[in-house]
Amino acid sequence: MRHVRTTLLMASQQLSSAVQWSTAQKAVQRLVPPLSFDSRKGQNGRIGVLGGSYEYTGAPYYAAQSALQAGADLAYVFCADGAAPAIKSYSPELIVLPCYKTANMNDQQATATAMQEVRPWLGRLDCCVIGPGLGRDEGVLQGVSSLMTAAEVRSICTIVDADGLFLVARDPELVEGRTDCVLTPNRRELERLAARLNVAAEADDVAAQVARKLGNVVVVAKGQRDVITDGTDVLVCDEPGAPKRCGGLGDVLCGALAPLAAQAARADAADAAFVGRRPLLWACYGACVASRRAAAAAFARKRRAMTAPDALAEIGGACESVAPTTVVEPPS
């Protein structure tokens, strides 16, 4: 029987219990709306990915395409102008918007351009993924900082990864106290956050301490096991993944998480299906399981030759295994 190990952190104590997979799946399933024949385009999620630079074009594509495979209706990519042609060529399904330049612009110009081009689109989004392939151009980072604040004002669920986490480590106030925000650090990124927040990186509960220091944002600490915590509750995902750790798998995870996170942000936390835990924690758990199953399936096919597109090809089926689609039949 599959299970997710769950830890409730209270003061100096740690209380552990096992939750059956059926309980976890029921919680995740509650975040996946049924499909109906009278639904409208966009009802199942409009996801924005803010990232992509001249050097890095694959990461935002993986995240946006994974969001579509996980059930979102629309995916936008807001990227540097030098990245847009490549990303457009990867998929005709993505809405790719070149929003800022880094060449021949000073930092102030790059910041202003990013703000002016992206801000009008924020109101269309249910969830924004910030960081895949973003790069560290100073003007762009300043623009993204302002956009993160604008997303908070509009209550847009936000997932921060990669260079977005570099930005958070530099300015933790960007996410402090945001209950609709998820950080998805790998080990090095978690260590950087811990150092910035004066948390011992070697502590067993480093992810939980980071989450608490940031005002109970949700942290998904990726590793051999994924630790999902808001500083109070902890879910540990030890679903088998793949021994091949290729670049891009974290982007696939962020994309798969986005539609679930958008639903979690407006879910009723009092719903009994969530067994007293925040819906956003269950959204992260479901995405972690799905991304690990996708990686395992890709590795089974390709073995050492496995790369991120192989996992991307499996993410739709993996999401279906976590939360099967239900369809509301039209009235006869």
Task: Identify the function of each model-found stretch.
Residues 1-159, 166-182, 187, 191-332:
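Small-residue (G/A/S/T)-rich helix-start motifs and N-terminal tracts that mark the onset
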